[in-house]
Regions:
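Long, well-structured alpha-helical subdomains associated
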Residues: 12-30, 34, 38, 160-208, ...
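Catalytic Zn2+-binding segment of zinc metalloproteases
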Residues: 136-162, 169-173
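Active-site scaffold of zinc-dependent metalloenzymes
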Residues: 82-133, 137-144
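Short, compositionally biased, intrinsically disordered N-terminal export/targeting signals
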Residues: 1-12
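Transmembrane alpha-helix/interfacial motif
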Residues: 37-45
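Membrane-interface amphipathic/juxtamembrane segments adjacent to transmembrane helices
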Residues: 47-97, 101, 271
Length: 276
């Protein structure tokens, strides 16, 4: 560690860190942040594991899903469901090095589903993962039948961008010492983890609202008993995964920020005037 002392002529000295310290801090912060982000898949495992089990129960949901599309009024608004399954070309690639090239691979395996607001389309495997369709129709309701849900949906992408930007900012050297007057930039640096978490909140909130509306639609469309209970459990696990993503993202930014701060923040040293 190298420390350089500078003075601002007000009996205040700053122990400033060297360029080598900044580089070391950047590398360690980047590595630590990457390690934390690698835990993300673990949050979705409970959801994926249950969804695989629900494939054999698909018939309990598929009819109600199509009924819900019609009864909800979404079909009249132009919402469609595309049954997304493997074609012959895809099947040749499964189990080979070409498998990652399969378009919508996770959806075709019945492990995911999506709603695209721009074209009002739900994509899922109707032969395996119809249970996910009610949640996706919940996204469609947010998009087309509710102002609050629509606002949340539009805030998702900017929130992702903000969180990613804060991850980068967390790696920038600190110029101001503790106790110095803050400006906007130093405030952002000192609070980047909190701001990153806030950036992820619209996604969590919109997902929760989609699950709530999807569950209500499933119940109104005839899903009941153990099938409804399993649906609620699956949607709860999905929400936990999004909460986990938000928490891990902010934790990653926090750790990177603290490491960078440790290696780069100047230390403010006030020397009493009687020593002059």
């Amino acid at each position: 560690m190298t420390i350089n002392f500078t003075n601002n002529d007000n009996n205040v000295y700053y122990a400033r860190r060297s360029r080598n310290d900044a580089v070391e801090g950047f590398l360690l912060a980047s590595m630590a942040s990457g390690v934390v982000m690698r835990t993300l898949p673990y949050f979705s495992k409970p959801f994926i594991n249950q969804l695989k089990q629900e494939h054999i129960n698909n018939k309990e949901y598929v009819g109600s899903l199509l009924k819900g599309l019609s009864d909800s009024g979404l079909e009249k608004l132009g919402v469609t469901i595309k049954n997304t399954v493997f074609n012959k070309e895809d099947l040749i690639k499964v189990g080979t090095n070409l498998e990652p090239l399969i378009q919508d691979k996770e959806i075709k395996f019945g492990l995911n589903a999506t709603y695209t607001p721009r074209i009002k389309r739900v994509k899922l495997n109707l032969d395996k993962a119809s249970i996910c369709g009610f949640h996706e129709l919940g996204h469609a309701m947010n998009n087309l039948q509710g102002k609050f849900g629509n606002v949340l949906q539009k805030m998702r992408y900017p929130g992702y961008v903000l969180a990613g930007l804060l991850g980068t900012i967390s790696l920038f050297p600190r110029k101001k010492a503790k106790g110095d007057k803050q400006n906007v930039w130093s405030f952002i640096q000192d609070n980047c983890a909190k701001i990153a978490f806030i950036g992820m909140l619209p996604t969590v909130a919109e997902e929760a609202l989609a699950s709530y509306k999807g569950t209500k639609l499933a119940k109104a469309s005839g899903v009941d008993g153990s099938a409804l209970k399993n649906l609620k459990r699956l949607y709860g696990k999905a929400l936990i995964s999004y909460i986990g993503y938000a928490a891990v993202t902010s934790l990653s930014v926090y750790i990177a920020s603290k490491i960078t701060e440790h290696f780069t923040r100047p230390k403010r040293i006030e020397i009493p005037s009687q020593f002059y």
